[in-house]
Amino acid sequence: MIENLIQNTTPSHSKSSDPFWEKSETALLQALMLYLLHEAPPEEQNFSMVMEMIAAADVHEDDDNYQSPLDILFERLEMREPDSIACKQYRIFKQAAGKTAKSILVSVGVRLAAFNLPSIAKLTMTDELHLQELGERMIALFCCIPDSDKSLNYLVGMIYTQLIQTLYRQADRIHKGRLPVPVHCLMDEYANISLPKDTFLSALATMRSRAIFCSIIVQNMAQLKAMYKDDWESLVGLCDEFLYLGGTEKETHKYVSELLGKETISTTSYNQSKGRSGSYSINHQQSGRDVP
């Protein structure tokens, strides 16, 4: 869940080479979510409560002895359960110096800011999707997003990523490798979703054996190149079929033409000369030409 969240809320064009911040955010989120998982009732195990816990965190750079309400919460848990995994992850976060810890809190808060919106909080308050059932019986799940606003597209990316992970667990642990009901993901306007590269390419290579299938629909090849840079050919190569419905983008035309290869052109020429010693000949030739 946390890896899914981090990957889908990290911009695809992000060039940060320092993993410290993401790992620090991950440690904090693990502490918060594990606390809710083990200590909170099911109705409080949601992103809204995670945001409340982040709001309860505070760091005073000039006072190392200051304890925020969140610090006290984990301190009490550690007194009851010294080996709590949630407390162990929280201690990792607390190793950061005051200024660094505050930066981590700000970074997590910005990453999860959308979950402060009432509509998003309500949407993620309870699990109404029951993703594990998609491979058990015939179900149609529609994820509709506006084409004029991309600010919340990552939510659909999270659903797809969580769906694939859930179905993998169902197939491997319950059905010994293959779902009883095949699941087909029709990813229309895939450029607006842009699933995390490493996770999705790995899944795309192995999902068919588990009766999970994806149709990746884009406007042109330029969209794939923009999303996956040097790995776009890997994504295309992992697809069994390639369907081209036409378009006006030059590079896509060129790519499809090269896929099709050359076609054989048969040419017949007729030559005739008139006069006292006139002649007539027919010449047949075959040549190769790129398919337009």
Named regions from a protein language model:
Residues 213-219:
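Structural recognition of the conserved hydrophobic beta-strand(s) that form the central parallel beta-sheet
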Residues 1-212, 227, 237:
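P-loop NTPase motor domains
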Residues 191, 220-222:
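Active-site-proximal loop/turn and secondary-structure-junction residues that shape catalytic pockets
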